Amino acid sequence: MEVAEIRQKIVENKEKLTSFRRSLDLDRLEEEIALLENQMTEPDFWNDNIAAQKTSQELNELKGKYDTFHNMQELSDETELLLEMLDEDDSLKEELEENLMQLDKIMGAYEMTLLLSEPYDHNNAILEIHPGSGGTEAQDWGDLLLRMYTRFGNANGFKVEVLDYQAGDEAGIKSVTLSFEGPNAYGLLKSEMGVHRLVRISPFDSAKRRHTSFASVEVMPELDDTIEVEVRDDDIKMDTFRSGGAGGQNVNKVSTGVRLTHIPTGIVVSSTVDRTQYGNRDRAMKMLQAKLYQLEQEKKAQEVDALKGDKKEITWGSQIRSYVFTPYTMVKDHRTNFELAQVDKVMDGEINGFIDAYLKWRIED
């Protein structure tokens, strides 16, 4: 590595550390650590063993963030000092490069910790695709998104499973529900929630005109046993139907598909992936609990927005990302302004750049 490259790398590292410091709010972090430490010195702290363990775990996590930041700061300062001494002693160059590599590794892991630090980021994810109005063209767009997310999941080590599939009238899909099982599935895929817009020459239009289509993507964390969402049996209507795979393959001769309707909210979920009615009901119930939990979180967020006077409409005009196939090729995220011209690669599941840009934008916003 040339000296000029080393200098540039040190400048970039200092900028990253400044960003980390701003995101962490070190003064607040120190106060939280002191508060929890004081709680743990109380004589009756261990009377409630479960609460005590939770507090202890929270303290360890906060201390871990705090200590790692200061370790990075010390390593950065040491790297700067070695650079100053390099003019007098060339033999320090190897040690300097090793320090930079070590700092890069720590910073990368630390950045991911900060980016995926919200509740349920580490949970599995449930993702739904719903094409908008536009008939076959819109339903085909939904199918292209299904392919994109399936390829993304497979390429990134997630177990991807189709929970429910409703085929389109001529092509594509009317709706699909997927599960992504693996570390940080929800934390990564939450960036995809919103309206996705397609512009292309429709293969279903004999006049070869340009069409604009929309599809909405919903993403929810799969809830584990530590999160309780009460669903009363009296509030649920269950219907059964014959289920089949994508495109109508393997259609069952018995009604194993399950559709649950939550009467108070009107939320409808269905599962067709399991071979048994019991299995599909269990999966559908988990999906319903996730939707009810998300609904409650959205209500809380709306209350906060109302207090702030922040009104944000969710409409087809508020798309989060546009995919332009013609007259030029471009995929652009309208929240982060991150864009790529290689639309084919994006549709093959290479959306990591959009996800990274979104997570960093969330921290800076």
Swiss-Prot record:
SUPFAM superfamilies: Release factor. Keywords: Cytoplasm, Methylation, Protein biosynthesis. It holds the Pfam family RF-1. Methylated by PrmC. Methylation increases the termination efficiency of RF2. One of its GO terms (molecular function) is translation release factor activity, codon specific. The keyword Protein biosynthesis applies. The keyword Kinase does not apply. It is found in: Cytoplasm. It comes from the Bacteria. The modification N5-methylglutamine is found at Q249. One of its GO terms (cellular component) is cytoplasm. Gene3D superfamilies: 3.30.160.20, 3.30.70.1660, Release factor. Peptide chain release factor 2 directs the termination of translation in response to the peptide chain termination codons UGA and UAA. Belongs to the prokaryotic/mitochondrial release factor family. This is Peptide chain release factor 2. It comes from Streptococcus agalactiae serotype Ia (strain ATCC 27591 / A909 / CDC SS700). The gene is prfB.
